[in-house]
């Protein structure tokens, strides 16, 4: 077996099949596993997906939320075992793949309208 095929096969085995379909503009709740000493707990991070990047095992997504008036962004690997689950709260209607402009907006201007489901 060639090395490229072997790497592709190993990567294919590591992909998660429980990842919901979401895209930039959607509001998601990420259940992240946090290890503190010998304890492991679940930490929730809810915000707007401002970008998705990459494909396959190296795919990532960035979630932005406002915490105490300060914008916080976290980058999560899509297929990471450290992410317990991803809940899609609402689907946003945007016309861009990367929503970096949200960093400059605040208050009501930073809201994203909900995408209508047919």
Curated annotation (Swiss-Prot):
Q: Which GO terms describe its molecular function?
A: structural constituent of ribosome
* Any single Gene Ontology cellular-component annotation: cytosolic large ribosomal subunit
**Is Acetylation one of the keywords?**
no
Whether Cell membrane counts among this entry's keywords is no
One biological process term in Gene Ontology: translation
Query: What is a single Pfam family found in this protein's UniProt entry?
Result: Ribosomal_L19
**Residue intervals passing through the bilayer:** none
Keyword annotations for this protein, in alphabetical order, are: Ribonucleoprotein, Ribosomal protein
Q: Which HAMAP family match?
A: Ribosomal_bL19 (MF_00402)
Protein task:
This protein is located at the 30S-50S ribosomal subunit interface and may play a role in the structure and function of the aminoacyl-tRNA binding site.
Family to which the UniProt record says this protein belongs: Belongs to the bacterial ribosomal protein bL19 family.
Name of the protein described by the UniProt record: Large ribosomal subunit protein bL19
| Higher taxonomy | Bacteria, Bacillati, Bacillota, Bacilli, Lactobacillales
């Amino acid at each position: 077996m060639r090395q490229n095929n072997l790497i592709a096969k190993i990567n294919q085995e590591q992909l998660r099949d429980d990842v919901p379909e979401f895209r930039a503009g959607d509001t998601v709740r990420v259940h992240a596993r946090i290890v503190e000493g010998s304890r492991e707990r679940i930490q929730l991070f809810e915000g707007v997906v401002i970008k998705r990047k990459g494909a396959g095992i190296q795919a990532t997504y960035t979630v932005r939320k406002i915490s105490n008036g300060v914008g916080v962004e976290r980058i999560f690997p899509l297929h990471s075992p450290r992410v317990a689950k991803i809940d899609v709260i609402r689907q946003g209607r945007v016309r861009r793949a990367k929503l970096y402009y949200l960093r400059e907006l605040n208050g009501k201007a930073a809201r994203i309208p909900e995408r209508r489901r047919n």
